Regions:
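Surface-exposed, charge/polar-rich loops and edge strands
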Residues: 1-407
Length: 407
């Protein structure tokens, strides 16, 4: 069956509201860890994760940083308008560049209270320290709105403006306002690159102590960047997967990491992705390696049979050659890769991840990695009191077939 024909109703489960974690635990690494491999299920705490990883593994994390993408304005009438900055128009060449803009920028946004705001109207927000921010409604674009933002002092970057005027955008299933503590806890300790509107939540559990334990166990780690968009929360609303449009996200990967991945796989050692965003980035590298000149990954690129038996090491070698020819040290592009049941994993042998919403593309990704056992894993987690979603517990899932064959 082609993934486009998959019925979404087959990938659901009942998630009681009291199982959704609305606050993080006091200690990051005290979260529970479900371990699945070879059909067996076990559990531990995140602080002991090194004991469950193969020696010589390479863990790959997403070092994106959540920006304070929600801004609240008040109209002169007192009406509240909230702007949720999603992504810049294509003319800016990506999120990272748009965040460096000074004085003014345009952004695609979701609007809370949109019916109270008319095209052309300007909202004004004055902040302590002299920051004055104005927002003008330009036009509606599908489900989003194009908003022109300008500010004084004009020398401030948009990233600085968001930091001073905005607040952290918590997921829609966390039914509370963002608190001061969320600025720290809804952020990984290794977050470096501004650009996400949602955290790569699998990494929220990791602490300096865990990184020390990984090094002591001869388990290496490195980083990619994928800026997480609000599309990560969108449920699949179509009856089949073919009716769903996967969101496009920006990725940034260094030549050094691609070399490390190639050598790790060539030596027969496993690559473990920390988070679904890292997994999608890593798998996208394979398709970039065997793809065309435009160096982007589209939604269904993995399902056309174009791999023709090309191994992951060969694909990465081709990608490195292409980067050498182009004289680039970093690969900055976009991916729309949809990973669902029927996908043949190329690079990732294991995944550290949280528990995901029913009928989501993230749950489909889990099903593609461990097959129908995703039901056993989720049933176990529900029956044994695991906490779900962004601030919840997580799991370490191994794709044994991938670990045995990828080199």
């Amino acid at each position: 069956m082609h993934p486009q024909d998959i019925s979404i109703s087959e990938y659901t489960y009942t998630l009681p509201s009291d199982r959704i974690a609305h606050h993080p635990l006091a200690e990051r690494d005290a979260s529970r860890l479900l371990i699945y491999g070879g059909g067996a299920i076990d559990e531990d705490l995140y602080r002991n994760i090194a004991a469950h990883l193969p020696t010589e593994s390479l863990l790959v994390f997403n070092n994106t940083k959540v920006v304070e993408a929600r801004i609240e304005f008040r109209k002169p009438t007192g009406a509240r308008i909230e702007i949720f900055c999603l992504e810049p128009p294509a003319e800016y060449g990506g999120i990272a560049n748009a965040l460096t803009q000074t004085g003014r920028v345009s952004w695609r946004c979701l609007i809370g209270g949109a019916s109270k705001w008319k095209p052309g109207q300007v909202l004004r927000k004055e902040m302590p320290g002299g920051l004055v921010l104005e927002a003008r409604y330009k036009e509606k674009q599908g489900d989003t709105f194009l908003i022109a933002l300008s500010w004084m002092p004009a020398e401030l970057s948009f990233a600085e403006v968001l930091h001073r005027a905005g607040f952290i955008p918590l997921p829609p299933y966390i039914h509370r306002q963002a608190e001061a503590e969320d600025s720290r806890r809804y952020q990984t300790i290794y977050a470096r690159q501004d650009g996400s509107v949602a955290a790569p939540t699998a990494g929220l559990h990791f602490t300096e102590a865990i990184f020390q334990s990984l090094a002591a166990a001869n388990i290496r780690h490195d980083f990619v960047t994928l800026h997480v968009g609000a599309g990560t929360f969108l449920p699949v609303k179509s009856a089949t997967l073919g009716g769903h449009t996967m969101h496009i996200e920006f990725i940034d990967v260094s030549r050094e990491l691609i070399l490390k991945l190639r050598d790790t796989l060539a030596a027969g050692n496993p690559v473990i992705a920390v988070g679904t965003t890292s997994a999608r980035t890593l798998e996208s590298l394979y398709w970039l390696g065997i793809g065309g000149k435009d160096l982007v990954v589209r939604q269904w690129d993995a399902y056309g049979g174009q791999d023709r038996g090309i191994t992951a090491t060969e694909a990465l070698a081709r990608l490195l050659d292409r980067m050498e020819q182009d004289g680039v040290r970093r690969l900055v592009t976009t991916t729309q890769l949809l990973i669902g049941p029927g996908y043949e994993w190329k690079i990732v042998a294991g995944l550290v991840t949280n528990f995901h919403q029913p009928e989501s593309t993230l749950l489909l990704l889990i099903a593609s990695l461990i097959g129908e056992d995703w039901r056993r894993v989720y049933d176990y987690a529900l029956e044994h009191g695991f906490r779900f979603l962004s601030y919840g517990d997580g799991c370490l899932l191994f794709n044994r077939a991938s670990m045995e064959t990828q080199a």
